[in-house]
UniProtKB/Swiss-Prot annotation:
The keyword Transmembrane applies. Keywords: Cell membrane, Membrane, Transmembrane, Transmembrane helix. The lineage of its organism: Bacteria, Bacillati, Actinomycetota, Actinomycetes, Mycobacteriales. This is Uncharacterized membrane protein ArfB. It comes from the Bacteria. It is found in: Cell membrane. It is a single-pass membrane protein. It comes from Mycobacterium tuberculosis (strain ATCC 25618 / H37Rv).
């Protein structure tokens, strides 16, 4: 029974670490996409606005 409890703890730790990694990667991709979109937006000088 000790093996099952230890294995369950390792499984929970793995799932928790995977969830944290997924959140970090998802947020960094969203932030990079948002920054990239802002960099590609034309400025007022490029659009001819005065």
């Amino acid at each position: 029974m000790d093996f099952v409890i230890q294995w369950s703890c390792y499984l929970l730790a793995f799932l928790g670490g995977s969830a944290v990694a997924w959140v970090v990667v998802t947020l960094s991709i969203k932030r990079a996409s948002r920054d990239e979109g802002a960099a590609e937006a034309p400025s007022a000088a490029e659009t001819g606005a005065q």
